[in-house]
């Protein structure tokens, strides 16, 4: 079967229905495959978002519970789209593109053209929805790719195996999300804050593969999160540096014994031990083992950790604060 590479996505199937979601403003679009809404496809509702949407008047899309088998793309012009589901357990956007599938040119589409959800727009928000790539153990297969700035994900699920989430650039905030995968399943060069998220490892591998630019003081920060694993005997690393200056910090995170005592891996490149910026503060649980961690990672003091907040990590030149 041939698939279009790049960001020209076509919805194949959509199934589901919609219920009211928690928002003070009425929805601009309702997605329901049974015909009770305005659209039967999530992508169709995104396409209708006007360029006039703003922080004061976002384009709110309500998605009823259901399994939506489609690819979605929020292009750069589609700012201030709010995609609101009812429950991430019952509202799922899923597809199964793998890197070896062929495009129209007859060549494999590659990793970066596999995402089920491709978010290029700034100021995008998703709540109560799961994004899934169901391709399985086929190599890198993205559930979501994010290139937008000031994007927010609350109470969302992200399911994949390898490279589940590509946060490529910009700033993102993840709150109360569940993220599953095995290898490098949170990766990219963005600045991201993960608050109270559940990280679940389905295979032995690496939680993160950051490619933080040297100019960025922060890369990924995980605060008050939990890390667990599928089965006894499964072992994984907190991260490995995709690029030399990878930055990952875990604050007050509970780690099961899925985490290897050494914590971090140098990607078979000792030179990256001198440049990677890996740190923890107050890790707890069987996987928390400061004394056994690699010597090139850091254990932060309470004073150092106190300075790492949503505001200091994500604020930037525009003082963005996704909590407000």
Task: Describe each PLM feature range.
Residues 1-22:
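Fungal secretory targeting signals
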Residues 22-324:
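Sequence-level preference for short, compositionally simple segments enriched
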């Amino acid at each position: 079967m041939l698939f279009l590479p790049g960001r020209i996505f076509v919805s194949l199937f959509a199934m589901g229905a919609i219920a009211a979601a928690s928002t003070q403003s009425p929805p601009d679009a309702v997605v329901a495959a049974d015909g009770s809404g305005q659209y039967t496809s999530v992508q169709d509702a995104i396409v209708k978002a006007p360029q006039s949407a703003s922080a004061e008047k976002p384009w709110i899309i309500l998605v009823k519970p259901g399994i939506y088998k489609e690819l979605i793309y929020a292009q750069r012009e589609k700012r201030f789209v709010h995609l609101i589901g009812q429950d991430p357990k019952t509202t799922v956007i899923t597809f199964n593109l793998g890197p070896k599938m062929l495009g129209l040119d007859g060549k494999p589409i590659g990793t970066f053209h596999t995402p089920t959800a491709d978010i290029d727009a700034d100021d995008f928000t998703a709540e109560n929805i799961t994004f899934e790539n169901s391709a399985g153990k086929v190599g890198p297969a993205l559930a979501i790719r994010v290139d937008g700035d000031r994007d927010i994900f609350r109470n969302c699920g992200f399911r994949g195996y390898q490279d589940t989430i590509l946060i490529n650039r910009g700033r993102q905030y993840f709150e109360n999300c569940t993220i599953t995968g095995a290898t490098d399943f949170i990766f990219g060069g963005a600045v991201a804050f993960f608050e109270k998220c559940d990280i679940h490892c389905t295979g032995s591998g690496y939680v993160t593969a950051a490619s933080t630019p040297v100019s960025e003081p922060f890369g990924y920060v995980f605060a008050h999160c939990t890390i667990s694993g599928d089965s006894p005997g499964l072992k994984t690393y907190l991260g490995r540096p995709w690029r030399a200056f990878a930055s990952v910090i875990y604050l007050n995170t509970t780690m099961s014994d899925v985490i290897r005592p050494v914590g971090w891996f140098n990607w078979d490149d000792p030179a990256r031990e001198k440049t990677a910026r890996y740190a923890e503060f107050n890790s707890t649980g069987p996987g928390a083992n400061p004394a056994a961690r690699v010597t090139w990672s850091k254990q932060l003091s309470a004073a150092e950790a106190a300075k790492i907040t949503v505001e200091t990590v994500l604020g930037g030149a525009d003082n963005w604060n996704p909590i407000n």
